[in-house]
Amino acid sequence: MNFDVVIIGGGLAGLTCGVALQEQGKRCVIINNGQAAIDFSSGSMDLLSRLPSGEFVADFYKSYATFAKQLPQHPYSLLGKEKVLAKATQFEQLATSLKLDLVGSTAQNHLRVTPLGGLRGAWLSPNSVPTVKGSEPFPHKTIAILGIEGYHDFQPQLLADNLKQNPQFTHCELSTGYLNIPELDQLRNNAREFRSVNIAQVLEHKLAFRDLVAEIKTATKGAEAIFLPACFGLDDQSFFNQLQQAVEATIFELPTLPPSLLGIRQHKQLRHRFERLGGLMLNGDRALKADIENGKVQRIYTQLHQDNAISAEHLVLATGSYFSNGLKADFDRIFEPVFQADIVGCKDFNETDRLSWTANRFSSPQPYQSAGVAINEKCQVRKDGQFMANLYATGNVIGGFNSLELGCGSGVAVVTALAVAEEIVGA
């Protein structure tokens, strides 16, 4: 099989790159080995939340110079400020065309409410998620936080107790309660099946929609705003929007323990757009090895195509980090399993020195989290000291930064994905 571009990995980075390439007329295939990290995400995306020094980032544009000086090997530093902002804006436009219903911009980070009642910086968030701008007070004075009877992945009282500690919510009057939804009685018999996705699947049929609306109205007791777990609306926000109209109140939803409906919805919309544009998904397949000649990848072999290699003019490595097996670790080394690319990390990290992988304090940023493949300003992958002409990397498989520490994982994924798509189209 021959394609213009082979993309290894079907998560946020891989699909974003694939959509951008298909829109430019490239024939792409995505080798997808299962669920991606986006299926477990909060639905909010971060461009850059903190500097390596720990300082909170409100304005990416103003903070970039300091950031690039502190972390020159970060993909943002390699790409340059103007390109990063251009690609971030391009993704905002893509999200609008996909009807992902996101709010936010590169001009200023906002704060989103977490499932435990904290506030976390974000670049983009679903418009159904409660957010505040900086130190501004939350616009509603009375909030009803409602869980679902028997559903343990969302704790209203814990959320309320923590939410009160934030200055933006000190003026709010909070109440908590639980919804009794008889439709879910069958799920309660098996705790393993009583998850957000299962709940959404049952409620999607709307067999007792009016009863659900009445139950919410009764439980809110006239509150201006309602916080619910994200269990309403499987494929998109349409069910949630209908519920909000019927209740005639301002309803917000909060991500639950994984799997997360907010992330799953985004994943589905990206995948559907890629396939509608003519892209091919090889689901349940896994890249194993590649033939490399004269600094170029000639062909790739997968678990389901070990005898019939897949070839392409360009290849994109979008396999993610350890979570999705984009990186692996033995006792004495961290490595990228498909191309055996060069590994880099942050200061003092050595991929073959196990003692350098971890920090002494459990709560400190862990050096192994900064490991990933080495790239240049074109996102080309380095192997044996040389940059590959037709192999690019996007997302968290790239090394040299700790996305958890900096709050930049989603931003790196989409910015590098769109930058790589531009490089390939212009090649």
Swiss-Prot record:
Q: Name one GO cellular component term.
A: glycerol-3-phosphate dehydrogenase (FAD) complex
Claim: ATP-binding is one of the keywords in the record: no
Do you know which InterPro entries this protein is assigned to?
FAD-dep_OxRdtase_2_FAD-bd, FAD-oxidoreductase_2, FAD/NAD-bd_sf, G3P_DH_GlpB_su
Q: What cofactor is needed?
A: FMN
What catalytic activity is recorded? a quinone + sn-glycerol 3-phosphate = dihydroxyacetone phosphate + a quinol
Keywords, ordered alphabetically: Flavoprotein, FMN, Oxidoreductase
SUPFAM superfamilies documented for this protein: FAD/NAD(P)-binding domain (SSF51905)
Coiled coil regions in record: none
Q: Which terms does the record give in the GO molecular function aspect?
A: glycerol-3-phosphate dehydrogenase (quinone) activity
Instruction: Spell out the family assignment given in the record's similarity comment.
Output: Belongs to the anaerobic G-3-P dehydrogenase subunit B family.
Protein's name in the database: Anaerobic glycerol-3-phosphate dehydrogenase subunit B
Which organism is this entry from?
A: Glaesserella parasuis serovar 5 (strain SH0165)
Q: Which gene encodes it?
A: glpB
